[in-house]
Amino acid sequence: MKGIFIAYDQAYNMEIADAMEEIGVRGFTMWQDISGRGSETGEPHLGNHAWPTMNNAILTFVPDDKVDDILAMIRAKDEETPALGLRAFVWNVETSY
């Protein structure tokens, strides 16, 4: 099992969750109106006068065989609109309840 944290510009709104459902991933936790700045490129998303945009984030836990499909979807969306900001981070989950 893997955990995937996806941070994205709020302009994507539910597009990320809807795309995950199309892949067969139903469960997730979403945070809205979070701030941040990418480590390499892109503008800050801080919700202030200088940087008014904000991010959302999703955390999902999926079987290993779903990871490549999710990352391919994320990569494709990011390549379509690179200025918005969209990143996914995957880590191992040893146990869950």
In which residue ranges do the predicted regions lie?
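Positively charged, small/polar-rich N-terminal and surface patches that mediate targeting and assembly
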Residues: 1-97
